[in-house]
Amino acid sequence: MKLTDKIRRVYLPMTETGFYILFCLQKEGHGYSITQKVKDMTDSQVLIGPGTMDGTLSKMEKDGLISFVREEEKRKIYRITDLGHKILDIELKRIERLYRNSREEG
């Protein structure tokens, strides 16, 4: 899939949930493993509920940001796609710019 205007409008800037899901899926994973990793990475400050996780994974898969790899013990394993990497890279650059600007002004 291509980085269309629609994809840009929907995903940029990213929600915190969307960002962490794409970030975690740089390595294959399932919803629960992502939830636990995000909880650990953020010292429990970001908690993604199962409904939010399932809905976001489903939408991202439909939009081509992630792809289903296989099923293990009734859990769907996903990974980020090239389009997902593009979105994540754009968002990381935006966050870096925000940080840089805050340092220059502060």
Q: What are the language-model segments listed below?
A:
Residues 1-13, 96-98:
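Intrinsically disordered, low-complexity serine/threonine- and proline-rich regulatory segments
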Residues 8-52:
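N-terminal helix-turn-helix DNA-binding core of bacterial DNA-binding proteins
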Residues 53-60:
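Basic amphipathic alpha-helical segments that dock to polyanions
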Residues 61-73, 79:
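Beta-hairpin "wing" of winged helix-turn-helix
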Residues 73-91:
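Basic, amphipathic "hinge/linker" alpha-helix immediately C-terminal to the N-terminal HTH DNA-binding motif
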Residues 86-106:
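Amphipathic alpha-helical dimerization/coiled-coil segments
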